[in-house]
Regions:
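Conserved PLP-enzyme active-site core in the AAT-like
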Residues: 26
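Active-site-proximal beta-alpha core segment in soluble small-molecule metabolic enzymes
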Residues: 2-3, 7-10, 17-18, 31-203
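Active-site anion/phosphate-binding pocket segments in diverse small-molecule metabolic enzymes
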Residues: 2-13, 17, 67-68, 87-89, ...
Length: 371
């Protein structure tokens, strides 16, 4: 590792592919996988992740917005791309020309897309999003009152609805009745639409990471793992999957300092040394993505031993207690999370979820890929 690099993440594309194949091995015949690559592939680097998934045989990926999809197409990613977030309808021609599939969750949005495509000779592939209980976006299917709107969307000449999907609120809880209710609403709505219109949705999908593990009956035609793909479980249930964390965060000790009993550390003087202490300064802070809410709660690994973080995490640095690890010197590498100290543990201590820690890794944290 270049010693000029202060803080970095190592991303194992080999482990990513291992996770893809491990999840794939649990899917029924004919069930496709869509790898969720939004938010720069949860901080892992969307281009490199998508390229590796494509090479491994993945048929679909999902991003949130047009810019994310355009970047992937420019990098040679040719597989199917689903845009989960709504785009401005006035770029409908660009969407169709880019060859992506757009999520459509309201009749107003469907009409606008169709209007901007009128007279172009283009059709935009789309997946209809159904709101079954997440409380966000999608055609409301709590009852049949919006059926006419969904049927109208299916009839629009410039939209080609190849798929239909929904999103679960609590699928990481096994046997949850609310997830069962959402699934029932989803299937009922599809059945009503197909019977009334004669339209057949080629791809039905609803299983996010939690449902991949907990609800195999909900895998249907395609599953949408995000966190699982990167080797992190959304909850304690693993479903027997042998996954490997693809990302590890490291920082190099910049200085070792000595402090006396009663000395205070960092902003706000929230930590007082209970005895003479030896601290290691790590050049990683909340500007890099190390959440300030982890202040005084997390550990790092140095020489295979845990060193507690003390005082408030600063913008560009933090301090850890190495009093009991006398061998620590400037230049030593600290593991902040990885295979031996999970991102899930750090997230729990910070009072958040692994998604936030992974996505928080800023651009100044160099990505080092292991291929």
């Amino acid at each position: 590792m270049n010693r000029k690099i202060r803080t970095w993440v190592e991303i194992s594309l080999n482990d990513l592919e291992h996770n893809y194949r491990e999840i794939s091995s649990r899917l029924p015949d004919g069930c496709q996988m869509l790898g969720v690559c939004k938010a720069n592939a949860y901080g892992h680097g969307a281009v490199r992740v998508a390229q590796r998934l494509q090479r491994a045989g993945c048929q679909w990926i999902a991003v949130n917005c047009y810019d994310e999809a355009e970047e992937l197409r420019a990098a040679g990613v040719t597989m199917n791309i689903l845009l989960l977030g709504p785009q401005s309808a006035n770029i409908a021609v660009d969407l169709a020309s880019l060859g992506v599939t757009q999520a459509v969750g309201s009749i107003e949005y469907a009409r606008e897309l169709n209007r901007f495509l009128a007279g172009t000779g283009l059709r935009l592939n789309a997946h209809m999003k159904l709101e079954t209980g997440m409380g966000r976006t999608g055609f409301d299917v709590h009852d049949d009152s919006h059926l006419d709107e969904m049927l109208e969307a299916l009839s629009l000449p410039h939209l080609n609805f190849t798929g239909v999907f929904t999103h679960f609120a609590v699928s990481d809880e096994n046997g949850d009745p609310y997830t069962q209710l959402q699934f029932s609403r989803f299937l009922h709505a599809i059945d009503r639409m197909e019977q009334a219109s004669g339209h057949h949705f080629a791809i039905r999908h609803c299983a996010n990471s939690g449902a991949v593990i907990n609800y195999p009956e909900m895998h249907l035609d395609m599953v949408r793992p995000g966190l699982l793909l990167y080797g992190v479980f959304p909850a304690k249930e693993t479903g027997g999957l042998d996954l490997r964390p693809a990302m590890s965060l490291y920082s190099r000790v910049s200085e070792v300092t000595h402090h006396h009993t009663g000395d205070t550390i960092s902003y706000g003087r929230t930590f007082t040394c209970p005895h003479d202490m030896r601290l290691a300064v790590l050049p990683v802070g909340y500007a890099d993505g190390l959440l300030r809410s982890l202040s005084g709660k997390g550990d790092v690994l140095l020489h295979g031993k845990r060193a507690p973080q003390v005082g408030r995490i600063c913008m560009d640095m933090c301090m850890v207690d190495v009093t009991d690890i006398p061998e620590v010197q400037p230049g030593d590498v600290a593991t902040i999370f990885g295979a031996d100290l999970s991102v899930a543990e750090q997230a729990e201590k910070a009072g958040t979820i692994p998604y936030e820690l992974l996505c928080a890794m800023s651009q100044r944290v160099q990505r080092v890929y292991i291929d």
